[in-house]
UniProtKB/Swiss-Prot annotation:
Main localization (coarse): membrane
NADP found in the keyword field: no
GO cellular-component term (any): plasma membrane
Residues in coiled coil: none
HAMAP family: YciB (MF_00189)
Key words, A-Z: Cell inner membrane, Cell membrane, Membrane, Transmembrane, Transmembrane helix
Membrane topology: Multi-pass membrane protein
Pfam families the UniProt entry points to: IspA (PF04279)
Keyword flag Membrane: yes
Membrane-spanning parts: 23-43, 49-69, 73-93, 116-133, 149-169
Protein name (record): Inner membrane-spanning protein YciB
Function: Plays a role in cell envelope biogenesis, maintenance of cell envelope integrity and membrane homeostasis.
Amino acid sequence: MRTVVDYGAAIAFGVAYFVTKDFQKATWVLVAASAAALAIGYAVERRLAMLPLFFGGMALVFGTLGLIFGSDVFVKIKVTVINLALASFLVGGVLLKRQPLKVIMGEALHLPDAAWRTLTLRYGAYFAFVAIINEVVRNTQDTDTWVKFRLALLPVALVFVATQLPFMMKHMAKGDDAKAVEPPDAGF
């Protein structure tokens, strides 16, 4: 269910675009699917988790701007803005001696601070890379290619996460060595 909420709007957008070949109609689907994903997420969890709220909110804002102005630029730059924001948040947090990824994922993982720092920098670099590549594709390719690229980012993200699993497993605290992590509630 969580995967549907997290990726459903992007997949619905891609399907709508390739069925209709109309970016505006696909943007309507993106906006509606993003709103539905937030509603489903709230209905299931009785709260809006921070990241789905961020992604859904950005899709609603940029999708709505695209519809109002009749331009595909807003939806296309959404990928850049989101990924730059995440990269800045993560890398900036490390520079300020904070552990932003630990706050977000701390309940699920118990890692030493040095491992959190490394993992945070890796995620920050990944998000910065995606933002840069999106700008290259957005500015050099046609809309069909950009939509294919956007859909390809979904499995690429899963592969990136999978490549981090060995590092996380290696550094996970075991048994009595695990510290009880009490990050702030990420829900709203």
